[in-house]
């Protein structure tokens, strides 16, 4: 049993999963979506939920630096509702401020990755950081792993 972390954007969803003990998170893939056309990648998410035996979702909440909520927060909450309705599994949110910036910094400094390569993995790495922060903060869904 694992938790699935998600970095929800308007065109992609970065996906990560925890290990079975809830200690670490690893990036899995980036699922293409299109909010304007109401294509949310749910079929692929269904496959991943089954493959990894997911028991709950942790979505990044992209609050503004002053802690206010903008339109992307609403989009993340709506995606969470869609997941809850589709899977009947619990969801929780993790403040994701600066996770994409941190992911990009890691790719530049530690992996010396080119801009084109960074673009292909950044959402997956951001999802991993979101879930890792959640696990380290002992979020309420961690008990579901036991």
From Swiss-Prot:
Cellular component, GO annotation: cytosol
SUPFAM superfamilies: Ribonuclease H-like
Keywords carried by this UniProt record: Cytoplasm, Hydrolase, Nuclease, Ribosome biogenesis
EC number(s) on file: 3.1.-.-
SMART domains per UniProt: YqgFc
Disulphide bridges: none
Subcellular location: Cytoplasm
GO MF, one example: nuclease activity
Keyword Lipid biosynthesis belongs to the record: no
Record has Hydrolase as a keyword: yes
GO annotation, biological process: rRNA 5'-end processing
Top-level taxon: Bacteria
Its biological purpose: Could be a nuclease involved in processing of the 5'-end of pre-16S rRNA.
Family per similarity comment: Belongs to the YqgF nuclease family.
Name by which UniProt lists this protein: Putative pre-16S rRNA nuclease
Organism placement in taxonomy: Bacteria, Bacillati, Bacillota, Bacilli, Lactobacillales
